[in-house]
Structures are given as C-alpha cells and as structure tokens.
Amino acid sequence: MTTYSETLETAAQQFDQAVKSQPSQLTVTEIGTVEEVQRGIARVHGLPHVQVDEVLRFAGGHLGYAFNLDPDQVGCVLLDSSDQITAGSRVERMHSVLDTPVGDQLLGRVVDPVGRPLDGGRSLDDLPREPCERDAPPIMQRAPVTVPLQSGLKVVDAMIPIGRGQRQLLLGDRQTGKTAIAIDTIINQLGRDVICIYCSIGQRSTGVARVIENLRRHDALDHTIVVIGADDAPPGLQFLAPYAATTMGEHFMRQGRDVMIVYDDLTSHARAYRHLSLLLRRPPGREAFPGDIFYVHSRLLERSTHLIQSAGGGSLTALPIIETEAQNVSAYIPTNLISITDGQIYLSPTLFRKGVLPAIDVGRSVSRVGGKTQLPAYRVVAGDLRLTYSQFEELERFARFSSQLDEDTRATLDRGRLIREILKQTQFQPLTLPQQIASLIAVTNGVLDGVPVDQLPTIERAIQDAVTSQANDLCAQMQSGKKLDKQQVGQIANIAAGAVHAHA
C-alpha cells in the first residue's frame, strides 16, 4: 500500500516529465494598432522596435511595410487595398524585409512586385526570394560596357547605339512610341541569350494586356518576365515595382547572364512616391516632389551595370521611360533622369505627326557609352549618315524661307529626305545586322538617289534580300564583328544597285 508521500512524489515526477516534453521556446510578437487609414497608407501605434522597410501584416492577411518611423507612430505603406483595414485593427511585425521571388521559373510569367501571379499560373511560393532593396555594385566590381545590345531598329543601332550594361533613357510626350521602341527591342533579343524584364508602373491594364499579347504573338514572352504595378493598384505597389523587377534581373546578372529591363514609366513611379510622401507628411520640394526623389531614381538605376568576371560577369541594361509634357525636357523629373542615365533617345511629337516612325529626334538624342560598343560594320556608314542627316535637318529649317536653292543644297535636301525615309521602320519588324547595313550603305552611296518615295519600302526589301542571299560571306563577317573595307562596301553597293535596277 503506497503512502501519501509516495503518491505525491510520483505525481511530481509525472509533472516534471510532462513539462520537459513540452516545447520550451516562447515566441514574442509585437502587436500594433491601426490609428488612421488613407488611400495607400496607414498610421500604426505600438510597434517600438519595427525597422524601415520591414513587412507588416494587417488584419485579413493584407501586407504593408514600414516607411516612416516617427517617435510615437509608424507610417506604413500598404501593398493591398485599404478597404478592409480599419482603425483599431491589429498589425503584426513579420521580422523580414520586402523581398521578391527570383529564378528561371519566372520566365514567361506575369507577376506583381511581391511575386503573386497575375496570369492564372501556378504559385511561386516555392521559389527563392531576395530583398527588393539592395546596394548597387561597388565601383571595383564594374566592368566597361563593351558589348552592343542590338535593338533591331536602324536609327538606334546606327546613330544612337546601346551597350549591354548601359542605362539609356527613352523620353517624349505621350503617344509618341516610347513603349513601341522598348517592345521592339525585347522582340529583337529572341535567340540572343538576353533575358528581358518589362516593368509596368501605373499603366492602364488594357495597355499592359496589349503589350503582353504582342510579346506572346512574336514569341518573345518565353524570355521575358512581366512585372505589373497597375494604375488601379495601391501606390505602394507601384512604387515597389521597379525595385522588385531589378532584383529579379540582378539574380541573373550575378550568374553571368545578360539582362535588359524596361521601366514603363518612371514618371508614374515619381508620382506614386509623391502621393505616398504627401500623405505621410514628408516635406515637399520642387513640383511637390520630395527632396530625395533624385536619390529614389539614382539608387534604382545605379544597380544596372556590367560586372567583372569575379563578380559574376553578367550585365543589366536599363531602358527607363519618361513622359514629358508639351516637349518640356527641362522639367524636374526628365532632367533628373537625363543626368542619371548614360544617354537619352528623344521622341518628337512633330515627327510622329509627320508619320516618321520611330519618331526619334536624332539631334536631341545621344548615347554617351554605346558608341564604344557599336559593331565595326556600322562605323563604315554611321559617321557619314549622322553628318548628312544633321546637315539636312538644318537646311530643311532654312529652306522654308527661300524658294531659290542652288543645286548642292537641293542635292543635300533630297539625300536627307531619302535618309529619313530609309530610317523609317514598321513596328514589330526588327532587322538583322546585314539587313540594316545593306539599307544604310545603299542610301549613303547614292544607290537610292532618284527612287520615288512611294516605291522605297519595296526596293529596300529587295536590296536586303539581295545582299543577304548574294553576300553570305560578308554577312557572316559583319555578324562576327569584323570591319568592312572600301572594296566590300562597294560590293554591297553594287548588289544594291542591281536590286534597284531590277525593280526600275
């Protein structure tokens, strides 16, 4: 018969075993309270240890992140709709910074900045994730830009060349063809081992759907990632979009691969940042933008570069798009971006109305880095082409005031008009290097002099077909990066002349 003390001792031992069998780790979670909600932002009380850019979970699983750290409250940017977030609801720290999925499984997908699929495809939760915000590569890890990025557009590749790792700005008034140039460049990367990322910021959903359909129709979606911060998305998601897209591109760059990213457009990005900053009572500056708007864009674009081999050896080429108003390129955001980037391509509404497509104003466009990467075949014609075209544009302005022109001036005007016609190009039809060189040699060597403008597109195609079929060795030489001598240029000009006579 057991005594009372033995029973008590047995119970104590069983209690000790039960306590030891339970997990001993306790989790401490900081819980805050929403004080105020406005469109895109919330003010939260009760998170004393929260950090900048830390992810916060609101009621219903909605996400946001810490943006302002004030002494008595936290200003949060919402990544989901604020309709279901009310004052008094709970907010929980996630102890992680904003991140986004990365990897090859993203190719061909349409996602939002935090990696949620928008195309109805499978979830991407199993992919590795990397922070959206990170420092740009240091100077000693950067290599010179030496390899060209072919756009497939004659006017760009010949006179405003782009290199892999360059930041080339596309700017112009709305509806002048900025996105069209970017999409043509993406299409032209098919088969060139370049991964493309199209980042839509504040654009209409119908316009983005049209872009995706065009990429799919031209077999360019398989090597492209589409990141969308639509116009009906919260401003915080629009602000985050380019940083998340850049993180996706940096992942491939560190693997030694070449990436091209299009930001369409950073004007909407700046407006989203202005919206958030004004709601969170950050001091406004010029045009009501916060004083750090330059830093916001520079820290984004400085992440695009060409890495040395020890750092990965890949490249990230940026094509940011900016929308100007009434051709005012000296406004605040355009001048900021011009000073940050390595060159700009300006699209003129005047040329657009004249039917000159792409409507690139060569005189106001420049590539400060790409000229060193241009393939030697272009250099045979690019210098004469730019000089002749610049003289033509200057003479054309003065010729309006005079009806009596000498023969040399008339010849320069006629040649300039031919060059302008030959630089026109239909959208979604990027040209190969031999096709471009054939057209440019034909126009600079006078082969097309006297050809009626209405017959020029047909004759140009005939010249391109003739050169690519009759001069295979020269085409291979151009593709390999070798220079053409005068005899070879003359050979191409003779083939072009034969094609012109055949269609006379």
From Swiss-Prot:
UniProt-annotated site: Required for activity, residues: 365
GO biological process: proton motive force-driven ATP synthesis
A single GO molecular function term of this UniProt record: ATP binding
Ranges in a coiled coil: none
Family recorded in the similarity comment: Belongs to the ATPase alpha/beta chains family.
Record-listed E.C. numbers: 7.1.2.2
Catalytic activity reported: ATP + H2O + 4 H(+)(in) = ADP + phosphate + 5 H(+)(out)
Name of the protein this chain belongs to: ATP synthase subunit alpha 1
Source species of the chain: Rhodopirellula baltica (strain DSM 10527 / NCIMB 13988 / SH1)
Keywords, comma-separated and alphabetical: ATP synthesis, ATP-binding, Cell inner membrane, Cell membrane, CF(1), Hydrogen ion transport, Ion transport, Membrane, Nucleotide-binding, Translocase, Transport
Listed InterPro entries: Alt_ATP_synth_F1_asu, ATP_synth_asu-like_sf, ATP_synth_asu_C, ATP_synth_asu_C_sf, ATP_synth_F1_a_nt-bd_dom, ATP_synth_F1_asu, ATPase_a/bsu_AS, ATPase_F1/V1/A1_a/bsu_N
Assembly description: F-type ATPases have 2 components, CF(1) - the catalytic core - and CF(0) - the membrane proton channel. CF(1) has five subunits: alpha(3), beta(3), gamma(1), delta(1), epsilon(1). CF(0) has three main subunits: a(1), b(2) and c(9-12). The alpha and beta chains form an alternating ring which encloses part of the gamma chain. CF(1) is attached to CF(0) by a central stalk formed by the gamma and epsilon chains, while a peripheral stalk is formed by the delta and b chains.
Keyword Metal-binding: no
Annotated SUPFAM superfamilies: C-terminal domain of alpha and beta subunits of F1 ATP synthase, N-terminal domain of alpha and beta subunits of F1 ATP synthase, P-loop containing nucleoside triphosphate hydrolases
Function per UniProt: Produces ATP from ADP in the presence of a proton gradient across the membrane. The alpha chain is a regulatory subunit.
GO cellular component terms, semicolon-separated: plasma membrane; proton-transporting ATP synthase complex
Pfam families linked to this entry: ATP-synt_ab (PF00006), ATP-synt_ab_C (PF00306), ATP-synt_ab_N (PF02874)
Protein location: Cell inner membrane
